[in-house]
């Protein structure tokens, strides 16, 4: 059955050229400056353009193609910079002494000071994106390949742009297609994840592995055969991996162990590059592909066999859960906000897990010894994960306000959660109070004892110990596990677990067992505190999005509103939007502590140089365990010790970071202006300025208005 509608919407440049064409009110044009804010707020709020779920679904689907085309353009730019402006080939020939750079600043008003010496006679800005390491792992050996990939990405960007137009204006899917979840699961699991992983595994085996094997052996990149030569000439591969000479025979004979020369199960890191064994990662991608190809055949479509999501959900009942998951299928196929909320929560958590794996199991060659890149990747993935998790709460709240129909959700799990929301929130609040007082209480105790000169009464590894015994037990079991579960593995999954192994590359520590002590125990409970407060704010926003004792008719006021009218004091900052706004601040809080912890811990206990005698000199000399047990220690030995280097960077090639540091604090202070000043103050000021303009007969046609309360908060939180 074909579920596509032909030519549903005319392509009209005249319509698109009119700002606000998606809304009757906005299309009339501006009366006041509020118009431009509403334009930004509603341009992508497809719910406000139409009530037709089919049209909304098509717009989202089309927008996804637009998003993909932007991603391809961005990627193309990265690869083009690598091809045109970088020292990639030099770095590839000597990655331990030459730093990655892909940007050379033009000599305008002395800015060329930013071009530091990155080694190999190249002057430029050191980059910390990890692209060089990724390219090496992919088997890219010269700049021509980067050019080709950049051009390929632009072609794909064009294709995506075309697809976005085509599937909205020429052949738009009907609503039934968007709601056919079993078919969608099969195709996404088997196609995207299954065949995607298999394709990547194929590239790794036929291109990446042989090229990296030769690079690791010290062969000049210019002498290594090109990718197509490995793909077309099996004998070339057989020289490196003998099992290639047997072709697919062992596969069909079930003698799979013959392939263990290029599909390994080693564990640990490659001592040459300090990255995971690429033969391990190729093996991993084949295993993942098999799993997802099977998963992509599990759901019932045309043949009457397999799982039905609706049946699974409706059968999901426990003795104390009433109607269980009945009604959730209808929610997830008719509310894209609900669907998005679940996906964002999952993807956000996964992104944070990725942040931790990037340093514990560094996947690319020479990544572990590039400390700036390690720090950047950790920070990047933590922030992205944080935004996605807050986004999950935002869309869950929008679902509650716009899409939730209480009459169809009686006594199922969602209804039951909403009915005992007071118990959930008050318990969560108690947990936050407990964690806050106890975690900070331990720090305050330590600061006081330190100030009174009583170090023997402090909580630290050298006085009253609070060892994280459960974390240490987990570390220990993981370090010992492979000897039982994977007897052929040479090391555990990550060197961080323990076991005494250390990998260093070019005299720099790649990774070693990370010791955990009292300082980690203390800061861990600060993490627990900040995360629980974030969850408290966000969950309260979702569970009270439709109604509360204070405002029983909140659902009628919408997702965002400043206050419940002038007649009711004390009802400001209660909208679901405001909870997202406040939750964002606590998310920022949480992530700051995490990044501080990671940054100092790694510099103190992991990163550093190692001499011929095997003596390690850590960057901050192992001061974390003693200093991180007091607030004063954090301020003096981490924040000031590190920030002062940035502040004193003027006049050196690092000065951009000093200026960014200054600028970031300026932006932060600027945000407070929007958060702490009332709307009326600005309106009064504007009217006074307007009076002067009128006096001189230069009054604007569009009447200036102060930002609304919600707009001011949006600007504040963004800055």
From Swiss-Prot:
Keyword annotations: 4Fe-4S, Chlorophyll, Chloroplast, Chromophore, Electron transport, Iron, Iron-sulfur, Magnesium, Membrane, Metal-binding, Oxidoreductase, Photosynthesis, Photosystem I, Plastid, Thylakoid, Transmembrane, Transmembrane helix, Transport
Subcellular localization(s) per the UniProt record: Plastid, Chloroplast thylakoid membrane
Keyword Oxidoreductase: yes
The UniProt record lists the keyword Lipid metabolism: no
Pfam families noted in UniProt: PsaA_PsaB
Record's cofactor remark: P700 is a chlorophyll a/chlorophyll a' dimer, A0 is one or more chlorophyll a, A1 is one or both phylloquinones and FX is a shared 4Fe-4S iron-sulfur center.
Listed GO MF terms: 4 iron, 4 sulfur cluster binding; chlorophyll binding; metal ion binding; oxidoreductase activity
GO BP: any one term: photosynthesis
Binding site for chlorophyll a': 665
EC numbers, comma separated: 1.97.1.12
Top-level lineage group: Eukaryota
Reaction equations catalysed: reduced [plastocyanin] + hnu + oxidized [2Fe-2S]-[ferredoxin] = oxidized [plastocyanin] + reduced [2Fe-2S]-[ferredoxin]
Residues reported in the UniProt entry to bind chlorophyll a: 673, 681
Protein purpose: PsaA and PsaB bind P700, the primary electron donor of photosystem I (PSI), as well as the electron acceptors A0, A1 and FX. PSI is a plastocyanin-ferredoxin oxidoreductase, converting photonic excitation into a charge separation, which transfers an electron from the donor P700 chlorophyll pair to the spectroscopically characterized acceptors A0, A1, FX, FA and FB in turn. Oxidized P700 is reduced on the lumenal side of the thylakoid membrane by plastocyanin.
Self-association state and partner proteins as the record states: The PsaA/B heterodimer binds the P700 chlorophyll special pair and subsequent electron acceptors. PSI consists of a core antenna complex that captures photons, and an electron transfer chain that converts photonic excitation into a charge separation. The eukaryotic PSI reaction center is composed of at least 11 subunits.
NCBIfam families the record matches: psaA (TIGR01335)
Name recorded for this polypeptide: Photosystem I P700 chlorophyll a apoprotein A1
Source organism of this protein record: Equisetum palustre (Marsh horsetail)
């Amino acid at each position: 059955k074909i579920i596509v509608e032909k030519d549903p919407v005319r392509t009209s440049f005249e319509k698109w050229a009119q700002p606000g064409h998606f809304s009757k009110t906005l299309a009339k044009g501006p009366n006041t400056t509020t118009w431009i804010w509403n334009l930004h707020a509603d341009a992508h709020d497809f719910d406000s353009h139409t009530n037709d779920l089919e049209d909304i679904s098509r717009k989202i689907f089309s927008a996804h193609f637009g998003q993909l085309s932007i991603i391809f353009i961005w990627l193309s730019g990265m690869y083009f910079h690598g091809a045109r402006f970088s020292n990639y080939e030099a770095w590839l020939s000597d990655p331990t002494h030459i730093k990655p750079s892909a940007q050379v600043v033009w000599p305008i008003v002395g800015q060329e000071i930013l071009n530091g010496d990155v080694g190999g006679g190249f002057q430029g800005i050191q980059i910390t994106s990890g692209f060089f390491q990724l390219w090496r792992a992919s088997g890219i050996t010269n700049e021509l390949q980067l050019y080709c990939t950049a051009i390929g990405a632009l072609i794909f960007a064009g294709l995506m742009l075309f697809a976005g137009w085509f599937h909205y204006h020429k052949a738009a899917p009907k609503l039934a297609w968007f709601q056919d979840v079993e078919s969608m699961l099969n195709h996404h699991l088997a196609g995207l994840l299954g065949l995607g992983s298999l394709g990547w595994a194929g590239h790794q085996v036929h291109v990446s592995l042989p090229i990296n094997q030769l690079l690791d052996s010290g062969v000049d990149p210019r002498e290594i055969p090109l990718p197509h030569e490995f793909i077309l000439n099996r004998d070339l591969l057989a020289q490196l991996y003998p099992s290639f000479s047997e072709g697919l025979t062992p596969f069909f004979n079930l003698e799979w162990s013959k392939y263990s020369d290029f599909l390994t199960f080693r564990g640990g890191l490659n001592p040459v590059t300090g990255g995971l064994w690429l033969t391990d990662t190729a093996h991993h991608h084949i295993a993942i592909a098999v799993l997802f190809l099977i998963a992509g055949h599990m759901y019932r479509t045309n043949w009457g066999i397999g799982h039905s999501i609706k049946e699974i959900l409706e059968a999901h009942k426990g003795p104390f859960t009433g109607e269980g998951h009945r009604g959730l299928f209808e929610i997830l196929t008719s509310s894209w906000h609900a669907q998005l909320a679940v996906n964002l929560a999952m993807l956000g958590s996964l992104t944070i897990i990725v942040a931790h794996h990037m340093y514990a199991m560094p996947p690319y060659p020479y990544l572990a010894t590039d400390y700036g890149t390690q720090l950047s990747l950790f920070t990047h993935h933590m922030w992205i994960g944080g935004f996605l998790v807050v986004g999950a709460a935002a869309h869950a709240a929008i679902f509650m306000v716009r899409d939730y129909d209480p009459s169809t959700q009686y006594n199922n799990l969602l209804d039951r959660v909403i009915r005992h929301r007071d118990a959930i929130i008050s318990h969560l609040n108690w947990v936050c109070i407990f964690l806050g007082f106890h975690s900070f209480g331990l720090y305050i105790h330590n600061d006081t004892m330190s100030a009174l000169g009583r170090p023997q009464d402090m909580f630290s590894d050298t006085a009253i110990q609070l060892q994280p015994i459960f974390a240490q037990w987990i570390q220990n079991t993981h370090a010992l596990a492979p000897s039982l579960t994977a007897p052929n593995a040479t090391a555990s999954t990550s060197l961080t677990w323990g076991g005494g192994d250390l990998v260093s590359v070019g005299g720099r520590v790649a990774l070693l067992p990370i010791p955990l002590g009292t300082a980690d125990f203390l800061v861990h409970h600060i993490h627990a505190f900040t995360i629980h407060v974030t969850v408290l704010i966000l969950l309260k926003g979702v569970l009270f999005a439709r109604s509360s004792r204070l405002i029983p008719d909140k659902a009628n006021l919408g997702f965002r509103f400043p206050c419940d009218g002038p007649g009711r004091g004390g009802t400001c900052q209660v909208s679901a939007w405001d909870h997202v706004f406040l939750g964002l601040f606590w998310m920022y809080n949480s992530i700051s502590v995490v990044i501080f912890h990671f940054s100092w811990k790694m510099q103190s206990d992991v990163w550093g140089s190692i001499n011929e005698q095997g003596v390690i000199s850590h960057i901050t000399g192992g001061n974390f365990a003693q200093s991180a047990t007091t607030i004063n220690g954090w301020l003096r030995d981490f924040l000031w010790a590190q920030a002062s280097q940035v502040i004193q960077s003027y006049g050196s090639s690092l000065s951009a970071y000093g200026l960014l540091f200054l600028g970031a604090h300026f932006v932060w202070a600027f945000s407070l202006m929007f958060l702490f000043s009332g709307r009326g103050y600005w309106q009064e000021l504007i009217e006074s300025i307007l009076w002067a303009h009128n006096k001189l007969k230069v009054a604007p046609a569009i009447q200036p208005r102060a930002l609304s309360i919600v707009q001011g908060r949006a600007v504040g939180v963004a800055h």
